[in-house]
């Protein structure tokens, strides 16, 4: 491996990359705060913009797709409306995907609330309980197919 970053990035072109990890939706709620809520000592966010993008391993595969790599993804999503949004975003990038659905957990969503260029809150919607043996086996089988 070279010490030259440009050479290292170019070496990724036209190679195959396998990605396994948490696929999620990153949401940014951006606005300004100019007042405090009368209900409690918290700022009131006046929303100017909302942005949703692939997060976790989705961010990795999105970045890899810009390098013309052949990218393979295995991940888990909930069986919910957020998973449909994530899958739509995956359709827009060049990735071979194998998504396993688990109706016992929500699709991970990380919502960041930003006011006046400062993050003031992050809300995580996820199930941190380990996946079932059945789902684990599905992930293993899908991964094996992608690698071989």
Predicted regions and their residues:
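Residue-level marker for buried hydrophobic side chains located in beta-strands
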Residues: 17-19
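Extended acidic/charged loop-beta regions that coordinate divalent cations
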Residues: 26-32
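Feature captures the catalytic cores and cofactor-binding loops of soluble hydro-lyases/lyases
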Residues: 35
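Short gly/ser/thr-rich secondary-structure transition/capping motifs
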Residues: 1-3, 137-138
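Conserved phosphate-binding/catalytic loop of the ribokinase/pfkB sugar-kinase fold
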Residues: 98-105, 112-146
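Substrate-binding N-lobe of the ribokinase-like
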Residues: 2-10, 15, 38, 42-109
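Active-site metal-binding loops of divalent metal-dependent hydrolases
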Residues: 23
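Short basic/glycine-enriched coil/helix segment immediately N-terminal to the Walker B
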Residues: 12-13, 146-148
């Amino acid at each position: 491996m070279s010490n030259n970053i440009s050479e290292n990035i170019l070496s990724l072109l036209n190679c195959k990359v396998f990605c396994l990890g948490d696929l999620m939706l990153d949401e940014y709620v951006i606005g300004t705060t100019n007042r405090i809520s009368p209900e409690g000592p918290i700022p009131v966010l006046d929303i100017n913009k909302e942005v949703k993008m692939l997060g976790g391993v989705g961010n990795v595969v999105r970045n890899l797709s810009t390098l013309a790599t052949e990218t393979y993804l295995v991940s888990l999503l909930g069986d919910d409306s957020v998973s449909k949004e994530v899958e739509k975003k995956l359709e827009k990038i060049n990735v071979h995907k194998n998504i396993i659905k688990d109706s016992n957990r929500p699709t991970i969503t990380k919502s960041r609330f930003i006011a006046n260029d400062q993050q003031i809150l992050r809300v995580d919607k996820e199930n941190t309980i380990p996946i079932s043996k059945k789902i684990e086996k599905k992930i293993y089988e899908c991964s094996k197919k992608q690698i071989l």
